[in-house]
Amino acid sequence: MSTGTVTIDRLGAQGDGVARTEAGPVFAPFTLPGETVSLAVNKANGTLISLKEASPERVEPPCRHFGPDGVNGTCGGCTLQHASDALYHAFKRNLVIDALRSKGLTPEVGALIIARPGDRRRAAFTARRTEKELLLGYNQMQSHHIVSIGECPITSPGIVSRLATIRKIAAAMASSAEPFRITVLETDTGLDLAFEGLKLSDPQRRSAVDAVLGERGIARVSLNGEIVVEPLKPAIDFDGVTVSPPPGAFTQATRPAEDAMAKLVLAHVGKAKRVADLFAGIGTFALRIARTARVHAVEGDDRAVKALDFAARNTQGLKPVTAEKRDLFRRPMMAQELKAFDAVVFDPPRAGAETQCHELARSGVKKIAAVSCNPVTLARDLSILTAAGYRITGVTPIDQFLWSAHVETVATLEK
């Protein structure tokens, strides 16, 4: 461990400031390009001791839990609250540009579709019972310490206003001091609380049920995928199609980002008559596309497939929708199968869709919409498609995780 004064050169891919030193790059959280800072340095990791000269792009963070001096610790939920909007938005867009450029791809990248405070309808908290209280919040940066939060400016008021209720229910379910996870989803009928990492005795189950029934605004509580209590069936609206997500199901974290993605995908699909939606989840795109086209939705999670299928069967005015459970990593749709479609949409996890893209490349499908939460794997997947003759017609970065280093992207291709 050593200390020294350095000048920050740029932002790294994780939102840390990066300083050039004789020993190599040093990564320092909570610093900005152009700043002169004093750091404690351990190998390539720098810890901010003091700010000698601040950047004009530095702003006051809106949350009291953010940064080295955060209340209850340094919350790991955000990394860039101290950056101006202009710097932050450029950083997000450049993540996509740089990833594409690393694969030799130089399409025009559109302006970032921005996120706003309070947009987040899904939040994953860590909790732990202590002798004095129930800690609920986010892990401290690079630590298992829980920063217990009293506010969260990125998260919807519907969740933040019920933090006390969530703590009450969590306290009723927690039986030890072991940490556990709560994913909270704000749905149209109330909060959907998905607990993981707990074991529940019968008395605790009854206590949890009583706690839920004594509160307003809670639609469902589940534990490890099994429903504990469901006063109201959780519901999400996909432009007029109502879906009830299974416990812990993947959903887009914000409704504005989801709407922006859907708008881009629908515009690209256009007048296609048969569309395949791969990694379809609970139907974010498939059920919207079904207003104008026949859709075959493919998803690896059985409960998500059933939720999508039920929604399609119980909504009037949709074209036929078929739903298939299939692990696309192990068994991608083959090129011959894909030839039946006019357009394909794919929205894989962070690992991307490399194997599937090799089949898409051989299929000759006229239009492809690629939705991604990882610019690096997106660039790899797009390079597979462009090598097969596809032309990138649009790239739009979308901010869904405000003040973080995560960015969504919709890329459209034609052949």
From Swiss-Prot:
Coiled-coil regions, chain positions: none
SUPFAM superfamilies, A to Z: Nucleic acid-binding proteins (SSF50249), S-adenosyl-L-methionine-dependent methyltransferases (SSF53335)
Superkingdom, natural source: Bacteria
Every TRAM domain range: 1-55
GO biological process: rRNA base methylation
GO molecular function: 4 iron, 4 sulfur cluster binding; metal ion binding; rRNA (uridine-C5-)-methyltransferase activity
InterPro entries: MeTrfase_TrmA_AS, NA-bd_OB-fold, SAM-dependent_MTases_sf, TRAM_dom, U5_MeTrfase_fam
Class of enzymatic activity (EC top level): transferase
EC number: 2.1.1.-
Keywords, ordered alphabetically: 4Fe-4S, Iron, Iron-sulfur, Metal-binding, Methyltransferase, S-adenosyl-L-methionine, Transferase
Residues binding S-adenosyl-L-methionine: 252, 279, 299, 347
Signal peptide: none
Active site per the UniProt annotation: 373 (nucleophile)
UniProt binding sites for [4Fe-4S] cluster: 63, 75, 78, 152
Similarity comment text for this entry: Belongs to the class I-like SAM-binding methyltransferase superfamily. RNA M5U methyltransferase family.
Entry protein name: Uncharacterized RNA methyltransferase R00878
Organism: Rhizobium meliloti (strain 1021) (Ensifer meliloti)
